Amino acid sequence: MARIAGVDLPRDKRVEIALTYIYGIGRSRSNEILAKAGVNPDTRVKDLTEEEVSRLREIIDKEYKVEGDLRKEVAMNIKRLMDIGCYRGIRHKRGLPVRGQRTRTNARTRKGPRKTVAKKKK
């Protein structure tokens, strides 16, 4: 099993797909990396040579922010928004949608399960 950026890539998948298991790498970035490394995207991970794996590892380490570093950067960006108290930061703090979606109905993913309020008795 090839290990790149601290992630074990699945052996039976194509390299193009297997690279997407790394946080911060999607299909287009995966193809970009494979082109730079000169590796055929249709190759299975188990068929990669040690040299190809080391080339992929080197390219990813040098040129891309992935896994822990990327997660940390995203978390710091959100924390910065919350600290400066801007609108987006406040929405993050309150656990509400940040990008202008309606909240009168829907928005259940961000708000979590319903908290039912009892009706007033007469």
Curated annotation (Swiss-Prot):
GO molecular function: rRNA binding; structural constituent of ribosome; tRNA binding
InterPro entries: Rbsml_uS13_C, Ribosomal_uS13, Ribosomal_uS13-like_H2TH, Ribosomal_uS13_bac-type, Ribosomal_uS13_CS
Gene Ontology BP annotations: translation
Residue ranges of the region described as Disordered: 95-122
GO cellular component: cytosol; small ribosomal subunit
Keyword annotations of the record: Ribonucleoprotein, Ribosomal protein, RNA-binding, rRNA-binding, tRNA-binding
Keyword Lyase part of the UniProt annotation: no
UniProt keyword Ribosomal protein present: yes
UniProt cross-references to SUPFAM superfamilies, sorted A to Z: S13-like H2TH domain (SSF46946)
Subunit structure: Part of the 30S ribosomal subunit. Forms a loose heterodimer with protein S19. Forms two bridges to the 50S subunit in the 70S ribosome.
Stored NCBIfam families: uS13_bact (TIGR03631)
Similarity comment: family membership: Belongs to the universal ribosomal protein uS13 family.
Biological function: Located at the top of the head of the 30S subunit, it contacts several helices of the 16S rRNA. In the 70S ribosome it contacts the 23S rRNA (bridge B1a) and protein L5 of the 50S subunit (bridge B1b), connecting the 2 subunits; these bridges are implicated in subunit movement. Contacts the tRNAs in the A and P-sites.
Protein name: Small ribosomal subunit protein uS13
Organism per entry: Thermoanaerobacter pseudethanolicus (strain ATCC 33223 / 39E) (Clostridium thermohydrosulfuricum)
